[in-house]
A protein has these predicted regions:
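Glycine-rich phosphate-binding P-loop
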Residues: 8-24
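ATP-dependent small-molecule kinase phosphotransfer cores
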Residues: 41-104
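Short, amphipathic alpha-helical "lid/cap" segments that border enzyme active or binding sites
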Residues: 93, 189-194
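RNA pseudouridine synthases
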Residues: 99, 111-119, 137
Length: 195
């Protein structure tokens, strides 16, 4: 039986998590968001909170850290100190590959589109929306005060873009990297699930 793997990348406030959960329910397959974080925390020994927030702190990449490799005083062998954000990414990537190998799933965020880019059963979706609509959702549905919502939207989207660029070399939200791009301000949540 063919697997159905759907990855969902999304702008903050576009309703991606809700859409992912509803889509998975409609298809009768599991949805992974927080579970990726929990499993990656187990594998890496890092806290789930650190892994969950790593996108906002993405300032360096594995390739940068390779250039910072140092010799230890105990051995003449070159050793690499892997930055914690890189360790978190690698742990999440391993979990995402395991999920996809196990069977059908909806996987939200975490560069899953890039990690599974060569999987023939994967469909990659990017969800975006009009700024005002996303702000409304952040305020009304997430319960964030208006002024804080504006700053959160800016910071989280910037963090996601930096994180994506750091680990994929590509531009987050670039339509050429996805199979489907939907403006949830136009489709609404039910329309996005139906699409």
């Amino acid at each position: 039986m063919k697997r159905t793997i759907i990855t969902i990348s999304r702008e903050y406030g576009s309703g991606g998590r809700t859409i992912g959960i509803l889509l998975a329910k409609e298809l009768g397959i599991p949805c992974y968001d927080r579970a990726v974080i929990e499993k990656a925390a187990e594998k890496s020994g890092m806290s789930p909170e650190f892994i969950e927030n790593v996108e906002e702190r993405a300032t360096s990449s594995f390739f940068f850290n390779l250039s910072q490799a140092t010799y230890t005083s105990f051995t003449p062998v070159l050793t690499y100190e892997v930055h914690p954000t890189d360790r978190a990414f690698f742990a999440q990537a391993e979990v995402i590959r395991e999920i996809a190998a196990h069977g059908s799933a909806v996987i939200i965020g975490r560069c899953a589109d890039y990690i599974l880019r060569d999987d023939p059963d994967a469909i990659h979706i990017f969800l975006h929306g009009d700024r005002e609509d996303r702000l409304r959702r952040i305020i009304e549905e997430y319960g964030v005060p208006a002024q804080e919502a504006k700053e959160q939207l800016k910071q989280i989207d910037k963090g996601r873009a930096n994180y994506y660029k750091s680990y994929t070399g590509g531009n987050w939200g670039d339509a050429r990297r996805y199979d489907v791009c939907l403006n949830t301000s136009r489709t609404g949540i039910p329309g996005a699930v139906a699409a």
